[in-house]
Amino acid sequence: MRTAARRRRVEKFARSVRGRNVWAGWYVLRDMPTTFRPCAPDQALLFPPSPREWLPEGHLAFFITDTVAALDLQAVYAPYDGDGRRNQPFDPQMMVTVLLYAYATGTFSSRRIARKLEEDVAYRVLAAGNFPAHRTIAEFRQQHLAAFEALFVQVVQIAREAGVVKLGALAVDGSKLKANASKHKAMSYGRMRTEEQRLREEIAALLTEANAVDVAEDAAHGPEVRGDELPAELQRREERCATIAAAKARLEARQAEEDRQKGRTPDDGRKGRGHKPFARDFGVPPDDAQDNFTDPESRIMKTSYGFDQCYNGQIAVDETTQIIVATGLTNCAADNAELLPLIDRAETTLGGAPTDVLADAGYRGEGTFQTLEARGITAYISLGHEVRPAKPPNPAHVATQRLAARLASDTGRARYRRRKAIVEPVLGWIKEVLGFRRFHLRGEAKARGEWNIVCLAVNVKRFHRLQAA
């Protein structure tokens, strides 16, 4: 009773002060007038603001705009020389800026980029009121892959001249990235032979049946009536048979090249060294060799989530700034053949050799160690995996023995541990933060070009963070 009486007194007081800016006990007077900031979406602006005022000072879009403006874009403009006003494409500098910003912020699809050009403020500022279609964006990216590789080199060289990147230690690593192809669109060589034979038999049976139908129709209607259209079921089988035959030929050509590199010749039969016969004829792949119908240049590789059609993307990263100074891409799952080419590209870009090279056990090899020693580069490369410790070095491999002794010291172990903190965060940032796990272009050359765009965008974003720090 006492509580109910108190509530009635509070409600009476609230009615008496309604419309005033007061509190009544635990009640808030919800119908009191409140002044809000004005909001008129349909109000036209007499003097519209500059688009640059839509973004805060120091925004990544402004940094990328200034960076692209400082680059030599002659390679990008070259394909348009002589077009005049007959065909007016979008400004290549604007297209480069938009693509770099898109990749730096995790947008890789040309359709999504085109949609962001209409909906995202930063994209509208970069494009300056231009709205290229998704097909235009995709064609521009594909047409200028070589130019983007040159721009990557320019950006690293600018960082070198500015003193951001110095000739010190490089950490090297690779990562398997999905190709623009499904592993379910691949077929083994053994199944190709079986499937090709089956399809040829079905085609022969269908042709026999079609000829019998033609003879019957000629007898019924006369030989002048057209009836030469290819049956749909026969056409489908012929197309599939041709596709399988082409894939089978690619596998055989690939195997023949591998056999030549191993010293075999087409006329050696199956007689090997020491009269030990080869397991197969020259140029004949094993039954489990596979080819993909969608992207024949991609390969089945083992990843952390299983086996898939992939390419192997490689990077060399500067120790002090985590700037990518060299890139590579291959369709070979093994890393050991990629270290020296990466070092060569880094030397060409930076104008000198690094002092140290840090890499995991996938890059080990006596020949590689000897080459690095001859070039005055100190290697800190693991000789074994965590689950498979390193075996004692072969006594004949003197460079490997010296590296093992170096890694056994406290200094060597500390230097090698730095590898994880230098290169692995960069790959993790590309795959986890940006979300780049799958190529959007098919073929090794095009995938390599897109990998250069990704690494260029990562470097530009890294420069932006270093500048803001």
Stretches found by the model and what they are:
Residues 37-38, 99, 107-119, 130-469:
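Anion-binding and metal-coordination hotspots
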Residues 23-62:
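Hydrophobic alpha-helical membrane-insertion signals
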